[in-house]
């Protein structure tokens, strides 16, 4: 009977995890009939989540079946709703509600993160760009608004959250809204955040460029007061201010997949599993975790991976390598990713690209935009379904420093 590696999730960590695991088996000359790799996800696609703030979100997915076929990885459609580390099984629910149990010898959990939705009254009226389905719903809503008579409320969008997502959504909106409402429409975009500075996690170096972009694009920032309620006509802040807005977009932070709690009791405040240096779960040594669901040290300086595709891709490579290596009795690798870069899209102003954890500015305006477009349209997409090229892309020691 063949041994089984299950990869749960088809985000960046899951896809590159499949590449990494297949590469190890190929290098060891192990046949798929002896060790079977299976990837489980609701759809055989990689949603290019960093692009959900852009126009035409329905196009932001990469098909996976040709790639998985090329590297000998099986695909199972469905969502995992339960994991038993004692029995080494997962419960998979298909789209039609059918439930089945799959056994594993090694498990790689890569179910990522999801938008944090606190108990704010009326939050169901807010849109998001968390998944393709959410971003398409927002796009359809804007199309419907375009058919309504112009009014200040129709032309106003309130973006709740002033982090990376909120910034990129807000700075892209003026162009998108003019394309839908007309070039002369009096557009208003307001970013609302509880912090006293825009992009609180960005640090001091990129922030002046974000402020410059906001001013250039006419994006307003209402800081120091969070949203306490949402309704179909706008939001109310903690300071009592009412903003009439036909569209509210919630970008209020992320939390790890709740499946994390089923493989470990040692979670950080974001719900991520605190993993060993090789991404193994100490409490469940047959389980490895990668991507947004893992709290993993990137270097020896006390830095930890962020919830980003940049870290998820490389963590996936290491996680896939290690889950296969461990099954074969080969030493695992310590996850290391000392290089870190940040590229924030700022709409028609351009983008700001920085390197290092202190975010030293390298490119801005049009040059930054060119780098961002390269990242968004090339670097974060899976390789072509060519076996040699795909397996090479799974090498954890050959990318991103």
Language-model regions, residue ranges each:
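Internal hydrophobic alpha-helix adjacent to the cofactor/substrate pocket in enzyme cavities
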Residues: 18, 175-178, 310-337
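A Rossmann-like FAD-binding core segment of flavoenzymes
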Residues: 34-36, 71, 75-87, 102, ...
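C-terminal auxiliary extensions adjacent to catalytic cores
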Residues: 348-401
């Amino acid at each position: 009977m063949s041994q089984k590696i299950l990869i749960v999730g088809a985000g960046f960590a899951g896809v590159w995890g499949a590449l990494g695991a297949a590469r190890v088996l190929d290098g060891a000359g192990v046949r798929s009939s002896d060790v079977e790799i299976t990837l489980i996800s609701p759809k055989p696609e990689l949603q290019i989540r960093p692009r959900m703030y852009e126009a035409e979100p329905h196009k932001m997915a990469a098909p996976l079946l040709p790639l998985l076929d090329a590297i000998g990885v099986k695909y199972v459609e469905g969502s995992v709703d339960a994991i038993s580390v004692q029995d080494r099984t997962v419960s998979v629910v298909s789209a039609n509600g059918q439930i089945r149990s799959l056994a594993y010898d090694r498990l790689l959990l890569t179910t990522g993160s999801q938008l944090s939705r606190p108990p704010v009254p009326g939050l169901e009226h807010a849109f998001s760009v968390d998944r393709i389905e959410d971003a398409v719903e927002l796009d359809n809503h804007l199309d419907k608004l375009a058919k309504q008579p112009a009014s200040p409320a129709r032309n106003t969008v309130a973006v709740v959250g002033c982090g990376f997502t909120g910034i990129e959504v807000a700075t892209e909106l003026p162009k998108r809204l003019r394309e839908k409402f007309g070039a002369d429409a009096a557009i208003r975009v307001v970013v609302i955040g509880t912090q006293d500075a825009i992009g609180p996690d960005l640090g001091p170096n990129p922030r002046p460029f974000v402020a410059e972009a906001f001013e250039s694009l006419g994006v307003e920032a209402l800081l120091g007061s969070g949203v306490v309620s949402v309704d179909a006509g706008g939001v109310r802040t903690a300071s009592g201010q009412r903003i009439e807005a036909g569209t509210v977009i919630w970008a209020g932070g992320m939390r790890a997949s709740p499946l994390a709690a089923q493989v470990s009791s040692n979670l950080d405040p974001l719900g991520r599993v605190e993993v060993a240096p090789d991404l193994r779960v100490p409490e469940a040594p047959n389980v490895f975790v990668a991507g947004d669901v893992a709290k993993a040290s990137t270097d020896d300086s006390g830095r930890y991976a962020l919830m980003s595709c940049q870290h998820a891709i490389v963590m996936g490579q290491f996680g896939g390598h290690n889950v296969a290596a461990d099954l074969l009795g080969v030493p695992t690798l310590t996850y290391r990713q000392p290089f870190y870069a940040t590229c924030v899209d700022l709409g028609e102003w351009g983008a700001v690209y920085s390197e290092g954890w202190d975010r030293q500015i390298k490119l801005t305006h049009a040059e930054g935009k060119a780098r961002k477009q390269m990242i968004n349209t090339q670097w974060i997409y899976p390789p072509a379904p060519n076996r040699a090229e795909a397996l090479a892309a799974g090498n954890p020691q050959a990318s991103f420093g």
